[in-house]
């Protein structure tokens, strides 16, 4: 008897499945193959039959028009609109303006800043050139191990902050560099960060594993485990999005050029005193000037978004311009060789005027000069 009931239930279930498949055959839902990244970020996506879809469209259009009427009086700033178009989840577009304000506040806190003159005040055995050689070498190490750019910028930040509080001798400077990169890589290189042995090897085994681990602990204590400070890259990621708005034909070029100029700025000890946001804005200013030398590199949107006027950038832009022309740091080759590669659009070889027009830095209200 039980077997007969089971058979009956199975027969009814089979009949339902057959009826469902026949209904789907009559109203087939078109499908297409999509890349995983293009899939909507929804866990409850279902296939809707065509007839129901038309009804939903009508309801949606009514609701949309109501929402548009409600939002008509709330016109966001142009820079917020740019953020809202971002598909990068790291940009967190619903909270973009709040995040920018928080980063600007955070970058200026003393615990996140190196001393602007730590070599003169704290270090007795180091020179600005030694620091520049270390930074240039760390750029090469980051390329060798294919580390993300955030790791490199954070490494230099850790080095400068550590040297601001702990005097060392020159023989330990390279050890500080690799130990700082080890910390930064563990923060950003989520998949397969380099091991301690890799950093020992890259120094030609000048330092042992125990020395690297010990210096890592010293750096963490000196920084009081404050490892999330904003870097030039933090702001560059956002500023370049605005800078690309009227450079539609050369978006990759301006992005790589901004990165190149930012890495050049890290070579120069003079730039330690500038906030990351100022260095980032200066890189954007100079990159736009290099690509289009006859067009004003700054405009109202950039001023509004970066919170810097062109006049605020003049000295910093001049330093990076000298670095680009090898008037400063001309013996350092790693950064320049990196950006001479085709994968970076050979931006290190782009010609630039030896002089920056002073008119571009006049503190005036810029309107529509994009």
Swiss-Prot record:
Keywords: Cell cycle, Cell division, Cyclin. One of its GO terms (molecular function) is cyclin-dependent protein serine/threonine kinase regulator activity. Pfam families: Cyclin_C (PF02984), Cyclin_N (PF00134). Signal peptide: none annotated. This is Cyclin-A3-4. InterPro entries: Cyclin, Cyclin-like_dom, Cyclin-like_sf, Cyclin_A/B-like, Cyclin_C-dom, Cyclin_N, Cyclins_cyclin-box. CDD domains: CYCLIN_AtCycA-like_rpt2, CYCLIN_AtCycA_like_rpt1. One of its GO terms (biological process) is cell division. It comes from the Eukaryota. Interacts with FZR2/CCS52A1, FZR1/CCS52A2 and FZR3/CCS52B. One of its GO terms (cellular component) is nucleus. Belongs to the cyclin family. Cyclin AB subfamily.
């Amino acid at each position: 008897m039980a077997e007969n009931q089971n058979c009956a239930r199975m027969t009814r279930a089979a009949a339902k499945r057959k009826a469902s498949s026949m209904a789907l055959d009559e109203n087939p839902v078109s499908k297409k193959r999509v890349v995983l990244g293009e899939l909507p970020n929804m866990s409850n996506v279902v296939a809707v039959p065509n007839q129901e879809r038309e009804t939903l469209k009508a309801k949606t259009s009514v609701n949309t028009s109501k929402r548009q009427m409600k939002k008509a009086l709330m016109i966001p700033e142009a820079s917020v609109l740019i953020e809202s178009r971002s598909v990068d989840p790291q940009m967190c577009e619903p909270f973009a303006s709040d995040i920018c304000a928080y980063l600007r506040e955070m970058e200026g806190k003393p615990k996140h800043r190196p001393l602007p003159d730590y070599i003169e005040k704290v270090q007795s055995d180091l020179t600005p050139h030694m620091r520049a050689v270390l930074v240039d070498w760390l750029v090469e190490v980051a390329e060798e191990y294919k580390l993300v750019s955030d790791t490199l910028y954070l490494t230099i930040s850790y080095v400068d902050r550590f040297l601001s509080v702990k005097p060392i001798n020159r023989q330990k400077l390279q050890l500080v560099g690799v130990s700082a990169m080890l910390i930064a890589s563990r923060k950003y290189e989520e998949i397969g960060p380099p091991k301690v042995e890799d950093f020992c090897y890259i120094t030609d085994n000048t330092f042992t594993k125990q020395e690297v681990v010990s210096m890592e602990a010293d750096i963490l204590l000196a920084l009081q485990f404050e490892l999330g400070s904003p870097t030039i890259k933090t702001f560059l990621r956002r500023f370049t999005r605005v800078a690309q708005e009227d450079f539609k034909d050369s978006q990759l070029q301006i992005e790589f050029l901004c990165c190149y100029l930012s890495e050049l700025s890290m070579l120069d000890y003079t730039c330690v005193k500038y906030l990351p946001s100022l260095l980032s804005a200066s890189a954007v200013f100079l990159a736009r000037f290099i690509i289009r030398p006859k067009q004003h590199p700054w405009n109202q949107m950039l001023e509004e978004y970066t919170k810097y006027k062109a006049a605020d950038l003049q000295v910093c832009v001049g330093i990076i311009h000298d670095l680009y022309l090898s008037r400063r740091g001309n013996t350092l080759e790693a950064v320049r060789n990196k950006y001479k590669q085709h994968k970076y659009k050979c931006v290190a070889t782009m010609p630039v005027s030896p002089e920056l027009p002073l008119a571009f830095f006049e503190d005036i209200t810029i309107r529509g000069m994009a």
